[in-house]
Regions:
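Membrane-anchoring hydrophobic helices of lipid-metabolizing enzymes
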Residues: 1-78
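Non-catalytic C-terminal accessory region of glycerolipid acyltransferases
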Residues: 3-4, 138-242
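Short histidine/acidic/glycine/proline-rich micro-motifs that form metal-
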Residues: 36-37, 111, 162-163
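Short, basic/glycine-rich phosphate-binding loops at helix/coil junctions
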Residues: 49-50, 119-124, 210-212
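Hydrophobic alpha-helical segments typical of transmembrane helices
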Residues: 50, 89-92, 116, 174, ...
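Catalytic core of membrane glycerolipid acyltransferases/transacylases, capturing the structured
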Residues: 57, 72-133
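Generic preference for hydrophobic
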Residues: 64, 80, 105-106, 211-213
Length: 242
């Protein structure tokens, strides 16, 4: 179901998203020049402007804890792992990141169907993941590693789908392969309250969202046994702040 309905808020939200994709000429110029740092900063600028403008349109407010745990750009790339309650989780993660750096996403394949969303995926250095397709999963792992090796951050929602409520589902074991393959640290993040925005009642509603950034987990320094233990610990850490 499309959460955006006809009316002023839909139009304003669409315009704000178009403002991000309108930067495509600048993105292409930076890519052609091989200016990775410039591209990362342009993504951050576009995402910050989008989330700061879209937030009042959607009626969202935020309460952020642990912001000091978000790595600075000079600390290198990382992956953000978060629970997934709602469509609005994108807003929550971008709000957390807006003063710290850009964020790409492991996105569902269905977004390709919508030109404006496909442009957002393309120009935010996000990647697609086709669920329940092992061959495509291997391809996505390679693409994610490439992005992270270049210095772009990535976010993944390890539950694989929205819980649409306060409760958190089980994490997919394969989700941790992204950070393990790229040898980057994980920032565990808990998001709570986004399901009030739409999923709870099936209509657009104001929502107060609590965002908790937990200490960074350096799985890139761990052996296989330690990484497996860390996976369970990360999942429990995220669940503990709900």
């Amino acid at each position: 179901m499309n959460i955006f309905k006809t009316g002023p808020r839909f139009i304003r939200g669409y315009i704000e998203t178009m403002r991000f994709t309108a930067l495509k000429k600048q993105f292409r110029k930076l890519r052609e020049a091989g200016d990775i740092e410039g591209e990362k900063e342009l993504i951050r600028f576009g995402q910050k402007r989008w989330v700061e403008n879209i937030t009042p349109i959607l009626g969202l407010t935020y309460e952020v804890h642990g912001e000091e745990n978000v790595p600075a750009p000079e600390d290198g790339p990382f992956m953000l792992y978060s629970n997934h309650q709602s469509f609005a989780d994108i807003c929550a993660t971008l709000w957390l990141m807006k003063d710290h750096g850009m964020m790409g996403y492991v996105s569902k394949e269905e977004w390709r169907k919508y030109p404006i969303l496909a442009d957002v995926v393309e120009y935010s250095r996000s990647i697609y993941l086709i669920r329940n397709n092992p061959k495509e999963a291997v391809k996505a792992l390679g693409e994610a590693k490439k992005m992270l090796d270049m210095g772009f951050n990535l976010c993944i929602f390890p539950e694989g789908t929205r819980s649409q409520c306060h409760e958190m589902g089980e994490f997919k074991a394969g989700a941790f392969k992204f950070a393990e393959k790229a040898k980057v640290p994980i920032l565990p993040v808990t998001i709570d309250g986004t399901y009030h925005f739409f999923e709870e009642k099936g209509t657009w509603n104001p929502a107060h969202i609590k965002i908790t950034a937990h200490p960074l987990v350096h799985i890139e320094t761990m052996d296989k046994h330690e990484q497996k233990e860390a996976q369970a610990a990360i999942e429990e850490t995220i669940r503990s702040a709900l």
